[in-house]
Amino acid sequence: MKWSEISVHTTNEAVEPITNILHEAGASGVVIEDPLDLVKERENVYGEIYQLDPNDYPEEGVIVKAYLPMNSFLMETVDEIKEAINNLLLYDIDLGRNTLSICEVNEEEWATAWKKYYHPVKISEKFTIVPTWEEYTPVHSDELIIEMDPGMAFGTGTHPTTVLCIQALERYVKENDTVIDVGTGSGILSVAAAMVGAKDIQAFDLDTVAVESAKQNIELNGVSEQVTVKQNNLLDGISGEHDVIVANILAEVILRFTDQAYDLLKKDGYFITSGIIGQKKLQVKTALEEAGFDIVEVLSMEDWVSIIAKK
């Protein structure tokens, strides 16, 4: 079978939404070639468990590659992808070069080539993310292993916004906490929350692809008893009081429900936000404070920030 390799040259800021667009278009596997992976700070802090080849990466920007089957609808699908990517400009997302190219690959090449980009990665004091096909032995007795299948939707969990969220969950979630995961995507944050002791986690996403992806990853990691995944628009219709709300989505979306998040948290509860590009940090901080939150910590990695607020 013949496959088309779709390559989008963009920016780090646009990687996650473009990845989601490609998966929704039917991509079977996505590769992210980000030169920042070669020099990430966490190499020094945690130590990467594999070596990267600089020849596989662009000199600037980020290349997102996706694989679509060759068929009569391919160019129509490509046009839809281009339109969806261009619509990201409405959210003030920098698309950089924003070029798209196509080349043909054999199934044998596709089935093995993209796996070379995915290896176990230690992303925090406790957590290591491991692709499902990799054999991995924990280095420490208290190491927590999250298994992910990068062939599924919504990436591998090693994007800075996800890493910052997991580091915050590790720090602020307590045993038996109740947690809401807004815009769950792959479900990785719900998995992490369960692994650090949360007893009841509600994971929401408006996208049906995300809901199914999250369910699979939650089952894969053995935390189905603690996590419930449902299709829902942000916090609409949600009630009760909760210990932690976590949201790794665009800054503009976070701004829509800061008041709702405040109302749904217990006293001294935490709102962990991420997906915020550095230039929008002040805007989100101001909105959180106006909603009544106290800012307790701001974590940063590359151009991204995670803001932790307390009720």
Curated annotation (Swiss-Prot):
Keywords: Cytoplasm, Methyltransferase, S-adenosyl-L-methionine, Transferase. One of its GO terms (cellular component) is cytoplasm. The keyword S-adenosyl-L-methionine applies. It is found in: Cytoplasm. Its EC number is 2.1.1.-. InterPro entries: Ribosomal_L11_MeTrfase_PrmA, Ribosomal_PrmA_MeTrfase, SAM-dependent_MTases_sf. It comes from the Bacteria. The keyword Transmembrane does not apply. One of its GO terms (biological process) is methylation. It catalyses: L-lysyl-[protein] + 3 S-adenosyl-L-methionine = N(6),N(6),N(6)-trimethyl-L-lysyl-[protein] + 3 S-adenosyl-L-homocysteine + 3 H(+). PANTHER family: ELECTRON TRANSFER FLAVOPROTEIN BETA SUBUNIT LYSINE METHYLTRANSFERASE. Methylates ribosomal protein L11. Belongs to the methyltransferase superfamily. PrmA family. This is Ribosomal protein L11 methyltransferase. It comes from Bacillus pumilus (strain SAFR-032). The gene is prmA.
